[in-house]
Each structure stands twice: as structure tokens, then as C-alpha cells.
Amino acid sequence: DNKHIIWMSERDNWNHLYMYDRSTAQPVHQITRGKWYVREVLRVDEDNRQIYFSANGVQPGEDPYLIRYYRIGFDGKDLVCLTPEEGMHRAWFSGDMNYLVDVYSMVNKAPVTVLRSAEDGKVVMPLETADISRLEAEGWKAPEVFTAKGRDGKTDMWGLIVRPTNFDPNRKYPVIEYIYQGPGDQYVPKTFIPYNWYMTSLAELGFIVVMVDGMGTSFRSREFENVCYKNLKDAGLPDHIAWIKAAGEKYPYMDMDRVGIYGCSAGGQESTT
């Protein structure tokens, strides 16, 4: 209407959408709110006063990095989740915004592709489901999603544990962490990964391989992200250490006397700090 601007900001500690008055540059009201993170605005439907966007962390109790797609009114009411299944979603909308093709998976869940209604997210028709039976027949094991508290004893850190295909719980395994903790992003895989050269190959050599996103990475709260502000040497390492110790306490086959770390680029800096 040329009177308002939709603005994205972390002003309340989480990345959200706000309605601003164009003439005064003052906020009119907050559109989205809660302890979650708006990732991308996909379309602003001015005729129907609706915003289509992606976000992570909306659903309580699940991995806060998993992306889903939503629709909400300009007034902040009637939030609708268009991709209700748990998973990391990637969607493409039709030109008229009536439908979306949604592909979703997790590290331990094979990809599924469906056609959905953009009105309510209901599945119009299934399109494809990946068949991983041959992969499983070869002995493939999915990574484990593991969660533990970080340095503050209260914030969940999310990571992966990758074991060799011939894993024996009665053995002791050296542990190696693949680290990349550069600011401005999040790095632990969230989609289906049948093979990951920097983790799977090492696991097949007889290691337990781990990866975790510590404080200082993106898509959580501003407070979480700002741990690395003017403090790159922190590298989230106190959170990584707490997470690995928690994993070692749960799984005695992880040899806490033989723990290594490696990475490249920012990960190279962090592994040699």
C-alpha cells in the first residue's frame, strides 16, 4: 500500500519480521515472534495480506535447525505450517502460489518428494520416495543425531555421531571431530547423507567421527551467534568439549583418552588453536 515496509530484524534476540511505518520509520507491530528464526521471505502477497516464508526452530522438541515453510497474515495472526512432517524441507512454489513441491529428509530419513497445497500444506499427491534398500543391504548405517548441553549447562548443542559399518560396541574406538565453526552459518548436515567423505571415510578406518555446531554459529538466537563477535578464537570449543564428554559418558566405547580434531579453512584454524 506504499505506507508500510516489512522488515527483518533480530531486535528481540531472534530473527523475525516486523511491520514498519514507511513515513516515520517506526515499527507498527511485530509479525512473527517466538524463540525461532525466520530464514527467508519467499513472497509477500499484498492482495491477500499474507507472507510466505521459511523458518527453523518453530516446532518445540525437535532439531532447531530443521527448516519448514509457513504462511502468516500481515497482522501476525493465522500462522500456518505448510510442511508439517519433521525434516529438513526444501520447497518450490508454483507461479500462482497455489502449490508447492516439497522435498524433505533427515540424516537418518531418506528423501521424500510431495506436491502440496499452499493453502494448508495438505499433500495433493506423492511424487517420489527414495529407495535406500540397496544401500542398507551393503551395511550402511545412518549417523546418530546427538544432543547435549553446551558450556552454560542449559543450551542444547546438536551434532552427529558416525560409526563404522562394522561397528562393535565391545571395542574401544578413538574419536575424531571434524570441525568447521566459521561465523555466519551452520555446518552439521541436516539432510540425508548416504556418504560424507570427511566423516564416513574416517569412520571406515576405525574411528568414531563426530561433528557439532557450537555457540557462535548461525540460525539460533542473536545471543547464541554473538559469542564469536570479536572473539573468533573461541570457536565454540567449550561447547564442543562439553558435547563430546557427554557422548563419551553415554557411550563407553568412545575412548576419551584418544580424541583428535581436524578441519580445513576456519576448521584448520580451530583445530590448531
What are these regions (language model features)?
Residues 81-83, 88-273:
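Serine-hydrolase catalytic core recognition
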